Amino acid sequence: MKIIEDKFLPSHFVNRYEDITPEFLKAHNIKAVMTDLDNTLVAFDEADANDNVLKWIKTLEDSNIKLLILSNGNDSRVAGFAEPHGIKYISAAKKPMLGNFHRGLKMLGTKKANTIMVGDQLMTDILGANRVNINSILVVPVKEKDGWATYLNRRIERVIMKYFKRKNMITWED
């Protein structure tokens, strides 16, 4: 169904955020990354950036690619992660609502065509990106277990992902 594809199909799929290289981003004319936090960069119950995340962030910075965390997480969670590393962020973003996607674009100073959203959820990250008309990358969740608030979204996502698999629109496994 076209509506499912329009709303929930990401531009790209990767296994993890580390697979998103500056070379890939530059090849797609991307100058800024908006990324989810929980289960995209770190597990939802992991408070701090680990060495792999910090290395990835430095790789983006060294390539002049801007970064902003766009998270539905509360301010203390997101600020506690982002501020020690000088990362711009928007917490309590209410994704897939559009307002904070637009705010993120303003904070980054980039156009939609040069910005990409990275996230692990179709129902929030990808739907929001598609609604605001920016490219998106769906990553496999860092941790199989999610917070309680994500449970229903994951059940709906399974149905949508099965549809995408049946139509050969995705290539990686659950």
Model-found features: residue ranges?
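Asp-based, Mg2+/Mn2+-dependent phosphohydrolase catalytic module
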Residues: 2-35, 42, 46-47, 52-117, ...
